[in-house]
């Protein structure tokens, strides 16, 4: 009978979805008793632990739902390697206030300059603010749209894409699109216009986007919507990935020289 209150409490806390309460209350009760704290302080600490853990789980869930190919933060981006990139603007955008204002971001630059890293970093920052985020490459997204159309579930996918607070479309311009694919992707942008924020990364300047969409009319209409409320990140320069590889190679050579001084 002495265990009945604990069993009932565990049952109620599970029903209320308070896992941190359940996990921590006994240990924290003993700790607060040792410190001479009253029941209000005890409950306050317990509630704070639950809130912190709930926020952590929420962020983890947002990150999982975003389907990032990798989790990267802006803290690990080497801004010095891409002098053309406005670091101040990027760090301001990391506050995710542009999402609330339904503004877009376009990162344009030659291949290997870290555009995907910037997109992932902005996406992670938005997840940490509790915002729903989706990530996909342009080619993969078009493939999903075509597949959904063939399987009679296009409307459901379009509603899902329109519902993200932030949608990140990576590598636009790397693969030319079919006419149907281009039209379906245009619909995604059109349905999100002034309803949600979209981040696009591309290796092509705007005047070459027609080569991707195949139609000047469609490209013009797309750019009109996408650039109405937009922050443009210029990211031209030497390959970010190549420079990172060179630095790693130099460090490895230096380490090898230290380990084997006779071979240096």
What kind of region is each of these model predictions?
Residues 19-70:
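Interdomain "pre-motor" coupling segment immediately N-terminal to P-loop NTPase/helicase cores
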Residues 72-94:
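N-terminal pre-Walker A segment at the start of P-loop NTPase domains
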Residues 102-118:
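Walker A/P-loop nucleotide-binding motif
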